[in-house]
């Protein structure tokens, strides 16, 4: 597989993306803090059937940082403009987490550009304000991100996470934090300004560390104060006309912190009520499903592509939605 990294200026903002394969267009949008490389386990097989574009969202990876200008609608408009300027044909859009919300926004607001949507464990309804602040553990996690980054080693040494069935938060294991922190500092000293890529780490941890080392923390800051949350989730889901698959990963509720995960069953049921032809797949997998279950993920994309073949595009309505500023 020949994979090329390229840059494109989208609405005045430079975006990095990777491109491979030939066939119907397929765009991959990673979740918050993750670079396009998070799709490396599925890219080779997808590129056998599709012309694949894996995009670094603004503020992520090698894409330009735009502090003070992070909203779901801006990121959604970035994707629409990328589809128009770079892809040049209607595409299947697959997004993980916040990337799933971005793909849904694009499908709702530019129906002529999106053939189908695979929303991989997006925070549907839980990433609306004030629910994100009041009913999700991830808001506490985001506050920790803002307080500790760019001290990447310090981030892990003070990280605490909830565990299903336990009230008390579990600290990141100190011996692991010590070893990881030392490796991060050595890498930063040897390669100042470069992504922190520690190859002996498990792949998901390695990508998380790398992503955070390139990440504009202001993207997360916008999630702590609600300025990110300008998307009406119900309205967007209801306006998606193309085929859509929603993957729900594992989640649970903590008695004091609320939802731990992207969606609960009530959120999924609400999405299904808004879009009756929605295909829902519930997987007992962690949040980044394409890393945890790459073969099953590719199969889900291929099944969605079959449904997309039979979909007749509806042209954009005459009243276009307002464009988000760059």
Which residues are covered by each model-predicted region?
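Conserved serine/cysteine hydrolase catalytic core
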Residues: 193-274
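Alpha/beta-hydrolase fold catalytic core
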Residues: 1-26, 47-50, 83, 87-89, ...
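Catalytic histidine-centered segment of alpha/beta-hydrolase-like enzymes
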Residues: 285-294
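Flexible "cap/lid" loop of the alpha/beta hydrolase fold
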Residues: 118-167
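Active-site loop/oxyanion-hole signature of alpha/beta-hydrolase fold enzymes
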Residues: 40, 54-94, 98, 136
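Conserved HGGG/HGGXW glycine-rich cap/lid loop of the alpha/beta-hydrolase fold
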Residues: 13-65
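Active-site loop signature of alpha/beta-hydrolase-fold enzymes
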Residues: 34-35, 60-63, 125, 254, ...
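Conserved hydrolase catalytic core segment
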Residues: 51, 89-133
